[in-house]
Amino acid sequence: MDLDADFLLLHLSDSALPTGAFAHSFGFETYMDAERITNAEEFQDWLKVLLKVQLTSSDALAMRMFYATPTVSELKRLDERLFAGTPAREIREANARMGTRMAEIVAETYSVPLIVEYLELIQHRELSGHPALALALATHSAGIDVDRAIHAHLTATVSSLIQNAVRGIPLGQMAGQRVMFAMREHIGAAVKRSANLDEIDFCSGDPGLDISQMVHETQRARLFMS
């Protein structure tokens, strides 16, 4: 067992990592405002769609594609495609902020090939930054299996959104934990599903999710930045 690799994975996929994820609902606040998400069950239904469609075809597939071709040119291509394939401005900005912060944390704490170059490209505004790619750089460098890396990233993302729902809807703490436990099989299924996707599936969207994320830009009263 490589304890250093395990530590890196646990550290960088911790939902409490200071990337700013606590400030984003990724559109569920729009459904809250419309009173379509009012309880744990309704939130869980939304979360399953986000995971199955957006997170699987964007974050998970991008990580898998980088692992297949771990080069600077592929990193640039994936970063650009993730940005271009995200319709909602707030989500593009959220990914850029969290991706930049993740890259800064990795560069500060671990010796990872390409991460300094990635961070410089972000800082020079040549790339936008994305947390899934910054994590993939670190996990690939540590020799962590791609499925484990994707599973950890999706778990952390789901956990962050549940924490935001607990204080936003609000939900009880135990209700949030029940949602987290119920999502375990859906996270595993998303990892497996991403292995069967290819280039044509990259950044596949769901009209309802995309529209809710764009509507949030003009929502008058809100707790979250996206």
From Swiss-Prot:
It comes from Corynebacterium glutamicum (strain ATCC 13032 / DSM 20300 / JCM 1318 / BCRC 11384 / CCUG 27702 / LMG 3730 / NBRC 12168 / NCIMB 10025 / NRRL B-2784 / 534). Belongs to the UreF family. Induction: By urea and nitrogen starvation. The lineage of its organism: Bacteria, Bacillati, Actinomycetota, Actinomycetes, Mycobacteriales. GO terms for molecular function: nickel cation binding. It is found in: Cytoplasm. Keywords: Chaperone, Cytoplasm, Nickel insertion. Required for maturation of urease via the functional incorporation of the urease nickel metallocenter. GO terms for cellular component: cytoplasm. This is Urease accessory protein UreF. InterPro entries: UreF, UreF_sf. UreD, UreF and UreG form a complex that acts as a GTP-hydrolysis-dependent molecular chaperone, activating the urease apoprotein by helping to assemble the nickel containing metallocenter of UreC. The UreE protein probably delivers the nickel. The keyword Chaperone applies.
